[in-house]
Amino acid sequence: MFGDLFEEEYSTVSNNQYGKGKKLKTKALEPPAPREFTNLSGIRNQGGTCYLNSLLQTLHFTPEFREALFSLGPEELGLFEDKDKPDAKVRIIPLQLQRLFAQLLLLDQEAASTADLTDSFGWTSNEEMRQHDVQELNRILFSALETSLVGTSGHDLIYRLYHGTIVNQIVCKECKNVSERQEDFLDLTVAVKNVSGLEDALWNMYVEEEVFDCDNLYHCGTCDRLVKAAKSAKLRKLPPFLTVSLLRFNFDFVKCERYKETSCYTFPLRINLKPFCEQSELDDLEYIYDLFSVIIHKGGCYGGHYHVYIKDVDHLGNWQFQEEKSKPDVNLKDLQSEEEIDHPLMILKAILLEENNLIPVDQLGQKLLKKIGISWNKKYRKQHGPLRKFLQLHSQIFLLSSDESTVRLLKNSSLQAESDFQRNDQQIFKMLPPESPGLNNSISCPHWFDINDSKVQPIREKDIEQQFQGKESAYMLFYRKSQLQRPPEARANPRYGVPCHLLNEMDAANIELQTKRAECDSANNTFELHLHLGPQYHFFNGALHPVVSQTESVWDLTFDKRKTLGDLRQSIFQLLEFWEGDMVLSVAKLVPAGLHIYQSLGGDELTLCETEIADGEDIFVWNGVEVGGVHIQTGIDCEPLLLNVLHLDTSSDGEKCCQVIESPHVFPANAEVGTVLTALAIPAGVIFINSAGCPGGEGWTAIPKEDMRKTFREQGLRNGSSILIQDSHDDNSLLTKEEKWVTSMNEIDWLHVKNLCQLESEEKQVKISATVNTMVFDIRIKAIKELKLMKELADNSCLRPIDRNGKLLCPVPDSYTLKEAELKMGSSLGLCLGKAPSSSQLFLFFAMGSDVQPGTEMEIVVEETISVRDCLKLMLKKSGLQGDAWHLRKMDWCYEAGEPLCEEDATLKELLICSGDTLLLIEGQLPPLGFLKVPIWWYQLQGPSGHWESHQDQTNCTSSWGRVWRATSSQGASGNEPAQVSLLYLGDIEISEDATLAELKSQAMTLPPFLEFGVPSPAHLRAWTVERKRPGRLLRTDRQPLREYKLGRRIEICLEPLQKGENLGPQDVLLRTQVRIPGERTYAPALDLVWNAAQGGTAGSLRQRVADFYRLPVEKIEIAKYFPEKFEWLPISSWNQQITKRKKKKKQDYLQGAPYYLKDGDTIGVKNLLIDDDDDFSTIRDDTGKEKQKQRALGRRKSQEALHEQSSYILSSAETPARPRAPETSLSIHVGSFR
């Protein structure tokens, strides 16, 4: 399957087009890791299947269950190959369990996979791969197995091993009649809360009696009357394997939430069930059970992790522990000398005996490192040489394979070695550091292991006590009858009981795994080197370059990195038959300037791993002195640096141009900085380097003369760095006006100037070099010169910035520098006709109306001392508008009409109008100073509830005197639906800011449309501000002046009719309440309710006020606030209380704060629980509104996705909010019918 990827021939050569870049090596999929020192296999977690893994390991380490399953052959269960045949009855679940158990027993891998088994369960979604309850899985899996084994000799497998019965009895105290009921069980469920342990729980369940007396009598069928009685339960039949499920998870009815019981709950390693059984005449050994598995849950009731403690009954695993430091090593009399124990010969023989007398050589070094805590090279290489050489020198003990990849002990020395090892094993392991495992007396102690998905670790029996309590505690217990004895041939024999076809399958799989591991090991130890042949290179421009092409100069060599440098040199000699003389191999690297040699490789006896050569390394093959007759300097000190050198261009006549040119140059890193002047033939000059400390890297710093002898590296220059060269005899913008050199100057950059003078020229755009200190006047003159325009433009032109949308901004004064004008390098400027405004003038944009389209603004230059009135006249004249009914407004930052410029005699400077501002010509004359022009709207709640019956439909008079706004998401009532508001425009009034609210109402009543409403007096009107085309703030005090309301100059007022006058206090909140109609998802018409928030402002206070208003018991109502923008109702409950940790005081929810933000005009839904017990407050209109919002959001999302696809712009992932807890789903296993 791997093709020729793992060829035995390590040295392969290919001519590769190396110039295209290094190849990306695809790493082959590695085979599963072998078993660890315990020699037991774990099970891989598929995401959340730790609950399944723990139960499967328990069943696997139940030998009677495992062997009973193995006893079912293909003639009963069917064949895997026939599972897709329609007529074949293939019992896929038992087959997959057999194969999984065989893999856990025999396959040499760290962890087995349950993917095939879960597929046979029908688990195709991610839901089953999340964590579930292992107790639930235990019952479901047993049920699925029973169904799968119907009609086979194993049909009673679960019944024989796990089935037990309980008998419940009630004994009449009068006639002694016994009424009994028998129950079957596969596991016993016992309580944990308020119980000290398992024996205590069993005593409560099967020993203590429940007595029926007094008010709780029992009706006896024999006596036919209520009598005293006693109820009890007993275990009638005990299964060979007893499963106990602990009720760790309970429900707190006070907090209304689940919780995990973490109190101490003990359980014995051996338990006598005789006191709890109905029959007690049997021998005591019949009732003795031994604990052999504990499934442990770590976490809470909504998540966590399972693992299992398991007793290895058959001693299949290797049960070893680290020796404790506190214990003495051994009796000194029994110890050999430390030097003898520390001899590598003894340690290597011990390792080989542990590894079944065969191990790859490279793994032998790793095992040695693990044993003694130090590598071979550091401890023994100096005295004994390389490890492979040491093995070769002791050929009378060690036998290397033909390719020297593996090593084993010779047969004639293995017996002697084994006796030596047995004599010295204790000393060796006692001398090892604590990390290495030691041997223990594993015969007398029970073998317990902690199996945590893929990981298997040995534990001591006393470690089980740690799982009595806490967040990580026992959840299921498995006991086996102590009389169950295992046959001697099953001890430490994983092949016992496994059918032949599975033995053959596992043997073949192990051979395939070994082959793959060998191939993978070979691939992992093979790397690619790029050989650069010296004769094919020449030294040019400071670095090495191919003479012809990379194809002829570079050879790709695949080589085994476990071989030595001498082997590599010999292989290259054989490949390069034309080579004559010495051959030196050096590490080279491709740098921006070319190829550079860093260091030569020495020590032919070293392996390539020890020389630290990396995969894909560039190796230069040469004589070590010269290339093409040029002596080559090597090392990092003389590494070539590719620098960008900037200097002023020189024209053909020797005149210095203003254009700065950039050219690459290569210099050795250890060369003096001053050599750059020699390279450019500049006799004297100043060198500027880019200052790293400047923000954005836009600053330059001059190198002092005393530092000119420092090297490029000492100056901090590296590949890609830029340096600026200034000739000392130049007099241009790179010098200050005093012609003195400065130690810091700003970076030179460019501006783009476009010809917008409507004059013909050869160039439409030029690039002008400048610094941030360059004057705008100089840039303008340079642009006119380079655009080859008339010199007369110098007196009648200006530069105007162009924004990203192509709009021309206000002209920049000539006297400004680029920094003062806030112009960034790379900006675009337009050369336009007309002078730039002087320092006393303003350049303004203006447009008519508030809906300004981009590009339609007009321009004007005025004196900053001009008045608003005169400025308005100039703008009206320039735009061709007639009349005096106009006023000016300044456009605000969000491109909307701002406050009007009311002080018409004030100057623009006094009103802080600046160049570039936009003024809007708005139709309508401003009211006199101190007066307001207020639009008046009519606010009519739709429907008949509590309003004037003589009102006409507002839409009837729309065409004659008004316009209607319908705010579909406003508060209010509309018959049976919450909240639809119509605002009807009545007209404008002019009123003094000192007038009262009552005077505003009176003046509004003089508007012609008011005559049709028949409002008796201003006291029968309620005033609201208009915000976003619907009622906003309630204006409550009639005698308060309008100025004190701070309404602003753009205020609009809507008036609502009342049946009678009202006097609302400052703490009163006006609410629209609507009672829900049961069963119809609609509401009755709204009624106004005034709630005094000064009495507490809490949910309880409002609930009481609503209950009093509707004459209902407070405990029989539910209320909720309506959010019309979201079409949502938020229930208001007096139980919403928070408890702070410090003071332990209840913190009331004040409804005028979060999350309710209750204010005037809000809609409150009221539910009468006496006749309506539905939890829902929403209406059909809410459903429709939410659906429309969802469709709009979906449309916006699709348009955004389409825009992103067009622009190929990938948005960075936003922070994901915490996901709500997913609903719990039931677990099931799908089984076919075999009846």
Curated annotation (Swiss-Prot):
What Pfam family is a match, any one?
UCH
Q: State if Protease is listed as a keyword.
A: yes
Q: Which GO terms describe its molecular function?
A: cysteine-type deubiquitinase activity
> Can you supply a Gene Ontology BP term from the record?
proteolysis
Q: Which residue ranges does UniProt annotate as crossing the membrane? A: none
| USP domain ranges (all copies) | 41-482
EC number(s) on file: 3.4.19.12
Any GO CC annotation of this UniProt entry: cytosol
Compositional bias, Polar residues, is annotated for 1205-1215
Catalytic activity, as annotated: Thiol-dependent hydrolysis of ester, thioester, amide, peptide and isopeptide bonds formed by the C-terminal Gly of ubiquitin (a 76-residue protein attached to proteins as an intracellular targeting signal)
Its top-level enzyme class, in one word, is hydrolase
Q: In which tissues is it expressed?
A: Broadly expressed.
- Function of the molecule: May be catalytically inactive.
Q: What is this protein called?
A: Ubiquitin carboxyl-terminal hydrolase 40
